[in-house]
Amino acid sequence: MNNIDQLYTETKSMLSHIQNTPESDELLKQIEDFVATRSELIQEISLPLSEEERKQMKLILTWDQLIVKEMERLKQSIATELQQMKRKRVMHTTYLNPYNNITIDGTYYDKRK
């Protein structure tokens, strides 16, 4: 199996895996492994490509665009999770110590005359 065939199978399996698996730490680890393997395979590709290899490369490039979109979706979901965690942390500390963030600006309004 040559490098383009390996790249083809790796990309195809990664696309199906990233689309069908919910976000998790394991998925992120697999994405890192995929990117490392993929970069090695791309470095080993030698350039006069046959017609079949060109077709495979075109398909790999279209799949790559889909993988990038899925990775952007994962990035957005991770960012929203982080924002939610920060909000929960702020609400939790506010609940534990409600008088912590009171500002004292020296203003006192007397209602009596």
Swiss-Prot record:
Subcellular location: Cytoplasm, Cytosol
GO cellular component: a single term: cytosol
Subunit structure: Homodimer.
Keywords: Bacterial flagellum biogenesis, Chaperone, Coiled coil, Cytoplasm
Name listed for the protein in its UniProt record: Flagellar protein FliT
Broad class of where this protein is predominantly found: cytoplasm
Lineage: Bacteria, Bacillati, Bacillota, Bacilli, Bacillales
UniProt function note: May act as an export chaperone for the filament capping protein FliD.
Parts of the chain that traverse the membrane: none
Coiled coil ranges: 25-90
Family: Belongs to the bacillales FliT family.
An individual GO BP term: bacterial-type flagellum organization
Organism of origin: Bacillus subtilis (strain 168)
